[in-house]
């Protein structure tokens, strides 16, 4: 989500993406400069896109710069990498990338899980199998994936948008004119 990143007492509202190392095998993210230390658990390191680095630091290299996040202004984060950005029309926009932290509590719903299926696997059959899974959770009546939605990534933006988009009357008029 959007976070206020602080540098030299100036706030920059930026989009954050928390990932694990498998994201590099699924998505086209390149480390252009620096290291992948931002993927280490508890490293306090982050990666920044070229566009965000230009906005915050101008032509200076961002590597090694310490920044803060507004919700934790006493513990610095160190920029250790510059990464490529995606086109702006994406469900997963980002200015900064950091490591997602595992949450082993059942029912935790702070993450989206993306799965890459092999070419010969039916997405419908996969979704049916997952929906029928019952997970044995100690001290509970088991747990089932009730709100499971399987959507091809290419259709996600249209079928299940992540952001709550507010459509204004002007949008309706523009689409009516365009059609």
Annotate each PLM feature.
Residues 10-18:
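Active-site loop of classical SDR/Rossmann-like NAD(P)-dependent oxidoreductases
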């Amino acid at each position: 989500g959007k976070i206020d990143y602080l540098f030299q007492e100036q706030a920059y509202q930026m989009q954050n993406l928390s990932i694990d190392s498998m994201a590099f095998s699924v998505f086209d993210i390149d480390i252009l400069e620096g290291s992948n230390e931002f993927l280490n658990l508890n490293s306090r390191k982050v990666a920044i896109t070229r566009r965000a680095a230009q906005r915050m630091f101008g032509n200076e290299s961002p590597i090694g710069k310490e920044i803060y996040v507004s919700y934790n202004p006493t513990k610095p984060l160190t920029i250790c990498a510059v990464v490529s950005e995606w086109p702006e029309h994406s469900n997963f926009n980002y200015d900064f990338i950091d490591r997602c932290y595992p949450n082993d509590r059942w029912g935790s719903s702070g993450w989206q899980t993306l799965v890459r299926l092999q070419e010969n696997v039916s997405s419908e059959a996969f979704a049916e199998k997952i929906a029928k899974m019952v997970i044995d959770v100690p001290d509970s009546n088991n747990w089932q994936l009730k709100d499971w939605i399987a959507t091809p990534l290419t259709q996600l933006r249209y079928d299940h948008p992540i952001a709550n988009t507010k459509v204004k009357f002007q949008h309706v008029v523009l689409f009516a004119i365009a059609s």
